[in-house]
């Protein structure tokens, strides 16, 4: 057993070997690595959520055999906390984790916007298949889906996987980059 499982969880288990945030989290796997019960991990994560350190997104799933269902993505409300934990406070030109930083920033800003405007009917998810097809962030409101793909480079365009289009009829889709994020993230 580790002396401070929560600190170990934050510093070593939520991050991959390359020091970038491990978005996809399995409580069972973390519990095994930390040699604690899975409920301990869940309580630690809940405590960090209750103190506005991080938050989770659940997977969107229509019970298709190809969709990941029990995995969650974990994001930090404040990217500065993430940077301190991985001991990397360098400016962007000296970093290799632009994509993960950008995704965390965009998802957290969108979630803050939705909470501030009390838009509770909107539910937030991510989507992923076992064959690694993924959508970074999805909002569902009264049966309508809006999918977001976050790209650091304005030259790159995201694309909706055909599996998603087939399963979730007529979704709206937008690629968010540094040039358009204000127009996209801060609107209803």
List PLM regions with ranges.
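Conserved helicase/translocase motor-coupling segment
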Residues: 1-47
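A cross-kingdom feature that marks ATP-driven nucleic-acid transaction machinery
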Residues: 43-53, 57-188
């Amino acid at each position: 057993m580790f002396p401070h499982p929560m600190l170990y969880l934050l510093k070593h288990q939520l991050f991959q070997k390359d020091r970038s945030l491990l978005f996809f989290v399995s409580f069972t796997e973390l519990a095994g690595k930390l040699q604690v019960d899975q409920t301990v991990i869940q309580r630690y994560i809940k405590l960090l959520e209750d103190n506005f350190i991080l938050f989770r997104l659940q997977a969107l799933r229509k019970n298709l055999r190809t969709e990941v269902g029990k995995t969650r993505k974990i994001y930090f409300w404040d990217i500065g906390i993430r940077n301190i934990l991985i001991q990397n406070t360098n400016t962007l030109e000296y970093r290799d984790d632009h994509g993960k930083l950008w995704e965390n920033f965009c998802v957290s800003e969108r979630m803050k916007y939705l909470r501030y405007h009390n838009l509770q009917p909107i539910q937030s998810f991510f989507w992923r298949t076992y064959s690694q097809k993924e959508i970074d962030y999805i909002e569902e409101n009264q049966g309508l889906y809006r999918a977001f793909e976050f790209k650091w480079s304005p030259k790159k365009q995201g694309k909706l996987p055909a599996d998603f289009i087939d399963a979730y009829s007529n979704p709206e889709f937008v690629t968010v980059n540094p040039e358009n994020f204000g127009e996209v993230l801060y609107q209803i």
